[in-house]
Structure formats: C-alpha cells, structure tokens
C-alpha cells in the first residue's frame, strides 16, 4: 500500500505539459540541435505573437510613440540630450528656411514666368536641373517639379519633369552601381536583411520597384540605394520610374495653381481662391496618403516574399542534409548566389545545421622533405652500428606529420 501511494503521488506530481506528443517537425530535427533551436523558435514565435495589430487606434499609436520617446530620452546622457535638442532645432530652422526661400523663388519667378514659358533655353536648363538632382546626395527634385509646373503649366511642366526624372534615374542608377560595386558585394555577403530584400525583387521585381518608387523616399538617395540591389537592372528601374510618372503630375499641378493665384489673385473671387487653395491641399494630402499606404504595402509584400525565399532555402538545406550531400549552388548568378548563401547561413542557425560535412576525414601529409630524405637514405635490410638507433635517438626533427581533421557537427 505505501508503495502504491508513493507511485501515485509521483505520477500526480508530473506536469501535464511535459507529456504532450512531439510535433512532426520536432521529431525530424536532429537531437543535438533541439535545445538551442527550441529557444530560438520560441523566442521568434513570441516575437511574432507580440507584434502589434495594425488595426489599433490612432490614440493608442500616439501614446505608444510617446512612451518610447520618453524612455529613450531618460536613457540619454546630458550631452546626448543637448545634441538631440540642437538637432531638432536645426531641422526646424532648415525647414522654415526652405519654405521661405521657396516662397521668395516663386515671387521672383512671377514677373518672368510668362516670358519664360515659351523659351527653349529655359526649358533645357530646367530639364538639366531635374536630371542632375537625380544623383545622390543632391536635393531639390520636388522643388524643380513645382517650378516646372509654375513656369510651363501642368502638361508641359509634367513632360519636362517626367522625362528628366526617368533618364536621370537610369544614369544615376548606373553611376551609383559602378561606384558602389564593392560596397554591394560586402553587403550581400554580410547583411542578411539586405540579402533578403535583394532576393525578394526576383519574384515580382517590376511590381515591387513601382511600389518603392511610389513611396515618399528621398529621390536621389533612393536612386543610389536601389542601385545596390544586384537583382535590379537599370532598364527595369527606368521602366518602373516611367510607369509611376503620372504621380509627377501632382507637383506640376500645384505649381500651376500657385501661378494662377499669384497672377490673378486680386481678380479672383473668394470662392475661386478657396477652390484653388483647396485643390492644392487635396493634392498634397492625396500624395502623402498614397505614399504612406504604398509604403505599408511595400513592407508587407517584401516581408511576404522574404518568407517565401527563406522557405525555399530551408527546404533545399533539409534535402541536402537528408541526402548527406554538400550544399549546392542556389543560382548561376554569383551575386544572387552570394545573397542566397547569406540567408542559408542564417537558416542553418535556425534549423540547427552547423556543418554539412558528415564526418569527412581529411588526411594531411606534410611531406615537404619526404622525397629529398628518401634520396639521401636508401632502404636497407641490414642495420649496422654505424647508423643511428631510432629507438635511442627518437624521431628527430624532420619527421612526417599525419594530421587528421574531422568535421564534427555540434
């Protein structure tokens, strides 16, 4: 009876969670990798579960942002706080200064806009201006679009703006890729996030490029950044820029409305002024909302394609490991293969495959002086007293070294 009681107590003390049946994925995983991999898997699962839902209210997002900002502010040292305040003040001063200078530019252009509207040299100068600000780190691309609409009207200004933007983006792309080629190779080999984003563009590259071009990103910096993706070709990038060129009607339209208000503001009725001002505000709001929406969709699509690419690489790694064969190349393109290999190393750590060589034994023979010593010491069947005794003198210094290198999976 006491024995039965003790066994019953031990059975009841066992946690019910420990008796669950392992999933198929856990049973197929190597025993040496379960401990570390389970920790990473659980951490990744918890991180995915803790991701905030995008349908949260605006006030909740604002409160969360305020809390993060306050927490970051409290962690700063005194000089870091001083530097942050100075940086914010500098940005505000630059922003207001840019608005003031832009206003002065339009005031200066007002009297000459009608004369320059049909001038070919002015058209060429404006076109070259838009073309050259395509190269990083130059700025002023949006201002050139508004000025083009101000001087030449909506359609002529858009034609100037769009054509110079497309050709400028292609040339900037080629120049940036030439200059940054070594930087590209280092990023592909070391940064798994960059490698993942580069590989996602091979699925629906044109569609994703169009979405990126619609995002509210700095124009010249975006040209240089996208040129670092090895899977993007210059003509494809130029085609994506041409496809989204209707977006460039917005700054040209705003510039034309500003000219109308500047020239005929005194003659307009209050209703006409309000309509023109309202159209400008709606155009700006539509551009901001569209850019924000496309930016969110672009991030979601890139993450979806990255998961697909990782899944394909994971299946390839598992198949190679199950067949006891070395890892094969993922692509004939060396840069694409380097990016895929970077992701493969990350997937190896997640799965638990630290080495794909299954107990291969390499025999290394250090025989640099082997042939010379053979010629000096021919083989003899008889041993005389004149020769050294190997058991007394030892092996000496010039001996053959046999080293066994065994690759062991941890």
From Swiss-Prot:
The keyword Membrane applies. GO terms for biological process: mitotic spindle elongation; vesicle-mediated transport. Keywords: Golgi apparatus, Membrane, Transmembrane, Transmembrane helix. It comes from the Eukaryota. It is found in: Golgi apparatus membrane. Residues 149-258 are annotated as: VTT domain. It is a multi-pass membrane protein. Residues 378-395 have a biased composition (Basic and acidic residues). PANTHER family: GOLGI APPARATUS MEMBRANE PROTEIN TVP38, GOLGI APPARATUS MEMBRANE PROTEIN TVP38-RELATED. The VTT domain was previously called the SNARE-assoc domain. As there is no evidence that this domain associates with SNARE proteins, it was renamed as VMP1, TMEM41, and TVP38 (VTT) domain. Belongs to the TVP38/TMEM64 family. This is Golgi apparatus membrane protein tvp38. It comes from Emericella nidulans (strain FGSC A4 / ATCC 38163 / CBS 112.46 / NRRL 194 / M139) (Aspergillus nidulans). The gene is tvp38.
């Amino acid at each position: 009876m006491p024995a039965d009681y003790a066994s019953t107590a031990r059975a009841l003390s066992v946690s019910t969670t420990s008796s669950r049946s392992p999933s198929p994925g856990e049973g197929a995983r190597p025993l040496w990798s379960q401990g570390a991999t389970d920790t990473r898997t659980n951490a990744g699962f918890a991180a995915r579960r803790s991701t905030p839902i995008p349908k949260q209210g605006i006030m909740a997002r604002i409160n969360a942002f305020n809390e993060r900002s306050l927490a970051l502010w409290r962690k700063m040292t005194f000089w870091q706080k001083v530097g942050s305040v100075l940086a914010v003040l500098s940005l505000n001063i630059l922003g207001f200064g840019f608005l003031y200078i832009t206003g002065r530019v339009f005031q200066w252009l007002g009297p000459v806009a009608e004369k320059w509207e049909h001038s070919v040299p002015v058209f060429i100068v404006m076109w070259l201006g838009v073309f050259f600000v395509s190269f990083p780190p130059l700025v002023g691309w949006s201002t050139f679009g508004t000025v083009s609409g101000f001087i030449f009207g909506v359609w002529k200004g858009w034609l100037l703006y769009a054509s110079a933007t497309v050709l400028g983006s292609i040339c900037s792309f080629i120049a940036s890729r030439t200059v940054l080629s070594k930087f590209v190779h280092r990023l592909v080999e070391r940064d798994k996030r960059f490698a993942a984003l580069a590989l996602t563009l091979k699925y629906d590259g044109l569609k994703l490029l169009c979405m990126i071009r619609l995002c509210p990103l700095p124009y010249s910096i975006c040209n240089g950044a996208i040129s670092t993706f090895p899977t993007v070709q210059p003509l494809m990038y130029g085609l994506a820029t041409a496809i989204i060129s209707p977006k460039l009607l917005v700054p040209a339209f705003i510039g034309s409305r500003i000219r109308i208000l500047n020239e005929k503001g005194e003659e307009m009725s209050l209703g006409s002024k309000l309509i023109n001002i309202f159209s400008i505000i709606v155009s700006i709001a539509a551009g901001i909302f569209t850019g924000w929406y496309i930016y969110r969709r672009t991030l979601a699509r890139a993450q979806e394609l990255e998961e697909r690419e990782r899944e394909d690489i994971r299946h390839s790694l598992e198949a190679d490991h199950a067949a006891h064969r070395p890892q094969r190349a993922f692509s004939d393109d060396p840069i694409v293969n380097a990016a895929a290999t970077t992701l493969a190393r990350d997937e190896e750590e997640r799965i638990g495959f630290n080495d794909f060589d299954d107990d291969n034994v390499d025999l290394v023979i250090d025989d640099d002086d082997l042939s010379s010593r053979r010629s000096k010491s021919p083989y003899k069947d008889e041993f005389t007293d004149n020769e050294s005794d190997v058991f007394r003198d030892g092996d000496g210094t010039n001996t053959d070294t046999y080293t066994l290198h065994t690759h062991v999976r941890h």
